[in-house]
Amino acid sequence: YKVLSIIEKAFPYKQMADRQSEMLLAQKYTQEKYDRLTRKYIMDYLQEMGFKSSVAGTRYLQEVLFLLVSGEKKMDETNISELYAAVGEMCNNSDTNIEKAIRVAIEGTWRTSKLSVLQKYYPYIYDEDRGKPTNRDFIYNISYKLRSE
């Protein structure tokens, strides 16, 4: 016991290092939990609009929105192709495949969901001739809406 006491007095940085590593683990756990909850909130919002969670484009859209909502990417500093590339890297896919999958998910939702539901969750103006918002407009408007809630 005395030997341990002498060692602890001689090496107080060991105890401090242990406390710091415990704090870092707690912060990491808290951040992971926050990220999980944020992703769930985004997916719930998309599903309420009519997006299907089983569609790959919806999951990619969730990741793109997460990057913007969590602050990992800034809306005013990031162009849309950088977001596709970041998600493509995370999901082992090309940015063009990410873009196309998101486009298909948006088109499918706009085709199958009720207009009243879409207007409730996406109250922004879009080109009526096209019948849906562009990927860029949708992503930036929804991320702004989610961040403000």
Language-model segment annotations:
Residues 10, 115-116, 133-134:
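Short alpha-helix boundary/capping motifs
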Residues 26-121, 125-129:
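C-terminal output/effector regions of signal-responsive regulators
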Residues 2-15, 20:
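Receiver (REC) domain switch/output surface
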Residues 121, 134-136, 140-143:
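Terminal-proximal interaction/regulatory segments of ATP-powered molecular machines
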